[in-house]
Amino acid sequence: MMEKRKTVKRTTIVLDKEEREYIDSLIREGKEPGIKPLISKMLDVYRSMMIYDWRFPGEYYCGISRIAFVNVEFINILLENIPREKWVEIGRKAGEAAKVSMEASLNVEADKRENWDEVFKRLRVQGFGDFYMRDKYIIIKAPFIDKYEVWEGFLEGLLGVELEARSSTAPFVFEILNFE
């Protein structure tokens, strides 16, 4: 009996001179290992950021949520003009909005612990930072917002948990108080 083999399809892409020179420069400078890994990365970003829904240029969506590319300084200026005692509440509201977006767009229920790996991956893809679970702790490495109070509220609203900050500088560590 013959075993069914997975066929590999070869594809030829005709690039403009400028496009090819750009790709070659990425490879030459060590920013990309080769054309195949670059294309694979681009497709991964295309899928994970739902670029097929974008109305390029200038109107970007990820499911039901409109996405805007803003620099972190913009976010920091906004936060600096909001009283510190409101940061947890603002974070919580943002987390609740992110929860609705993930559920409606990705069919991921963020308040179920079995989905947290997928939730953390989504946050990482969108540039929020690197999120990890360690026992009853959530760790955020390289957060794009440097105010732990905002993250405390955000994660509480998103994940439906009660947290206590264990560090006030990045990497942030939050203990889950209602951990079961």
Mark where each language-model region is.
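N-terminal leader/targeting helix
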Residues: 48-90
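An N-terminal amphipathic alpha-helical segment
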Residues: 73-139
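Short, hydrophobic/π-rich interface segment
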Residues: 118-171
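Short Lys/Arg-rich basic patches
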Residues: 1-20, 27
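A generic structural motif
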Residues: 170-180
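Short, basic amphipathic alpha-helical segments that act as recognition/interaction helices
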Residues: 22, 33-59
